[in-house]
């Protein structure tokens, strides 16, 4: 029985008793921190309201902030059609290729006559970069491929699907690669979709005047679904970190199985075309003979041939035949008749009186 009379102090039945026992001081007795101004004057409240109403509303308050540029995009101001003219700039940006000849065993060779690089698939080509003075800190070298012909220049140069599927790299769709540097970065412009690769510019080593970069092209020029025998140009630019172009060089590239043979063939064809053009100019400069003289000689010769040619004429009726035969015989007789001899004029002077001089044995008309 004693256990039943015991009640828990925090049970629902005893909560009201507990709440009643809680004592709290009245609000009026609570001390608050003293303010400099215990009350806001009416004038101050009015001034604040007017200032708030006069302030203009910023319409750009709720606009989204622009997204930071992604690493996949190059310079956002990249033109739709890149410039292909050479521009050395104030730093004297130049390129130089190794001389390797036209032997069949070479994997890369450059033609100065055609300004064209011939190389094998995925084989490195050494390119020497020369500058007149040091560029700004953080400068980079960028390589971009575009199509040469006007009808193809708007298209993006990519690798063919066959070579892409055989590659597991993240940048497997890029045609150009820069080998030998772990700091190479591959970009695809978000708007033009053109692909490029960059490496930081490194100053020449001690005792050298140039910096060497290694380029490799990962698809043949004849690959279906890729370049498909369309000629391409490689644009190599010197840029700042912000993408400002400091120098530009451009050269044509052909990726083939036998660079030496193709270079020799194309150089021969180019020289032949230039010689033919010079010969054509020389022929145009030589004065042509008078066309009227040629025309007259041709007309005279043709008329003579027509006169000597024999024709056959079919005639109906004996009487008509006899008549035409007489006409033909008369024409033949007239043509074969010897020309009349010219009047014989005696040699020697003629006397002033008009009388003919008598020769020995001749008599005068008066006799």
UniProtKB/Swiss-Prot annotation:
Residues at the site labelled Interaction with DNA? 104
Find motif (Bipartite nuclear localization signal) and give its ranges: 282-300
DNA-binding region extent? 86-273
Pfam families per record? P53, P53_TAD, P53_tetramer
The protein's location, in the record's own words, is: Cytoplasm; Nucleus
Where, in this chain's numbering, is Zn(2+) bound? 160, 163, 219, 223
Q: What InterPro entries does the entry give?
A: p53-like_TF_DNA-bd_sf (IPR008967), p53/RUNT-type_TF_DNA-bd_sf (IPR012346), p53_DNA-bd (IPR011615), p53_tetramer_sf (IPR036674), p53_tetrameristn (IPR010991), p53_transactivation_domain (IPR013872), p53_tumour_suppressor (IPR002117)
Which portions of the sequence form the region Disordered?
262-306, 332-367
Region listing for Oligomerization, in residue ranges: 308-337
Question: What biological-process terms (Gene Ontology) are attached?
Answer: apoptotic process; DNA damage response; positive regulation of transcription by RNA polymerase II; protein tetramerization
Location of the region described as Basic (repression of DNA-binding) in the Swiss-Prot/TrEMBL record: 342-363
Q: What is this protein called?
A: Cellular tumor antigen p53
Q: Which organism is it from?
A: Tetraodon miurus
Q: What gene does this protein come from?
A: tp53
């Amino acid at each position: 029985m004693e256990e039943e009379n015991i009640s828990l102090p925090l049970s629902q039945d005893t909560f009201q008793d507990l709440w009643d026992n809680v004592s709290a001081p009245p609000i009026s007795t609570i001390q608050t921190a003293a303010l400099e101004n215990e009350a806001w004057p009416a004038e101050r409240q009015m001034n604040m309201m007017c200032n708030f109403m006069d302030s203009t509303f910023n319409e750009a308050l709720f606009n989204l902030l622009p997204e930071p540029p992604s690493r996949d995009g190059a310079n956002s101001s990249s033109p739709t059609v890149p410039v292909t003219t050479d521009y050395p700039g104030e730093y004297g940006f130049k390129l130089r290729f190794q001389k390797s000849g036209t032997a069949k065993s070479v994997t890369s060779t450059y033609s100065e006559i055609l300004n064209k690089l011939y190389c094998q698939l995925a084989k490195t080509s050494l390119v020497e970069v020369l500058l007149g003075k040091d560029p700004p800190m953080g400068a980079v070298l960028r390589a971009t491929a575009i199509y040469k012909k006007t009808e193809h220049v708007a298209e993006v140069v990519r690798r063919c699907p066959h070579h892409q599927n055989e590659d597991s790299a993240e940048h497997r769709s890029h045609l150009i690669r820069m080998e030998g540097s772990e700091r190479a970065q591959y970009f695809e412009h978000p708007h033009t979709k053109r692909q490029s690769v960059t490496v930081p510019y490194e100053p020449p080593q001690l005792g050298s005047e140039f910096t060497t970069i290694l380029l490799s092209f990962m698809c043949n020029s004849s690959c279906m679904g890729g370049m498909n025998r369309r000629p391409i140009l490689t644009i190599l630019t010197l840029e700042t970190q912000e993408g400002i172009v400091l120098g530009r060089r451009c050269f044509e590239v052909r990726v083939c199985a036998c660079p030496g043979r193709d270079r020799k063939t194309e150089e021969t064809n180019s020289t032949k075309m230039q010689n033919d053009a010079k010969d054509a100019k020389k022929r145009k400069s030589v004065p042509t003979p008078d066309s009227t003289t040629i025309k007259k000689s041709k007309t005279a010769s043709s008329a003579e041939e027509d006169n000597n040619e024999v024709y056959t004429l079919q005639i109906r009726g004996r009487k008509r035949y006899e008549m035409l035969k007489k006409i033909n015989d008369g024409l033949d007789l007239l043509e074969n008749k010897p020309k009349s001899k010219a009047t014989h004029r005696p040699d020697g002077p003629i006397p002033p009186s008009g009388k003919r001089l008598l020769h020995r044995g001749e008599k005068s008309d008066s006799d």
